[in-house]
Amino acid sequence: LLPNLLKSLL
């Protein structure tokens, strides 16, 4: 969940 958003930002 969170990791997905983080990767999207990066």
From Swiss-Prot:
<dbReference type="GO" id="GO:0005576">
    <property type="term" value="C:extracellular region"/>
</dbReference>
<protein>
    <recommendedName>
        <fullName>Temporin-1Tk</fullName>
    </recommendedName>
</protein>
<keyword id="KW-0295">Fungicide</keyword>
<dbReference type="GO" id="GO:0031640">
    <property type="term" value="P:killing of cells of another organism"/>
</dbReference>
<keyword id="KW-0399">Innate immunity</keyword>
<dbReference type="GO" id="GO:0050832">
    <property type="term" value="P:defense response to fungus"/>
</dbReference>
<keyword id="KW-0878">Amphibian defense peptide</keyword>
<comment type="similarity">
    <text>Belongs to the frog skin active peptide (FSAP) family. Temporin subfamily.</text>
</comment>
<keyword id="KW-0044">Antibiotic</keyword>
<comment type="function">
    <text>Amphipathic alpha-helical antimicrobial peptide with potent activity against Gram-positive bacteria, weak activity against Gram-negative bacteria, and moderate activity against fungi.</text>
</comment>
<keyword id="KW-0391">Immunity</keyword>
<dbReference type="GO" id="GO:0042742">
    <property type="term" value="P:defense response to bacterium"/>
</dbReference>
<keyword id="KW-0929">Antimicrobial</keyword>
<keyword id="KW-0027">Amidation</keyword>
<keyword id="KW-0964">Secreted</keyword>
<feature type="modified residue" description="Leucine amide">
    <location>
        <position position="10"/>
    </location>
</feature>
<dbReference type="GO" id="GO:0045087">
    <property type="term" value="P:innate immune response"/>
</dbReference>
